[in-house]
Amino acid sequence: MTKSELIERIAERQDQLSAKDIELAVKLVLEYMSQALSTGERIEIRGFGSFSLHFRAPRTGRNPKTGESVTLPGKYVPHFKPGKEMRDRVNESIQSEG
């Protein structure tokens, strides 16, 4: 699902809100989440999951064109951990399909 599909689905169910208002709300939520992660904060949405930063240690990589070894610096990457309710819902949905 893309951001625009999310906005469309919300607009279908919330006819008292304009699509522009929904779009603004979704963009603001994502912006605030990005800001929080960029300052090292953890985000927890109960029943959905949590977002945090994980550190990737420096490592040696390879340039795919030349095969030359390249030292890659350590970096922080966003990490999502689904909550129990989310895990259960996904597992039930997938098991009922299969």
Curated annotation (Swiss-Prot):
The keyword Transport does not apply. GO terms for cellular component: chromosome; cytosol. InterPro entries: Hist_DNA-bd, Histone-like_DNA-bd_CS, IHF-like_DNA-bd_dom_sf, IHF_beta. Keywords: DNA recombination, DNA-binding, Transcription, Transcription regulation, Translation regulation. GO terms for molecular function: DNA binding; structural constituent of chromatin. This protein is one of the two subunits of integration host factor, a specific DNA-binding protein that functions in genetic recombination as well as in transcriptional and translational control. Heterodimer of an alpha and a beta chain. This is Integration host factor subunit beta. It comes from Saccharophagus degradans (strain 2-40 / ATCC 43961 / DSM 17024). The gene is ihfB.
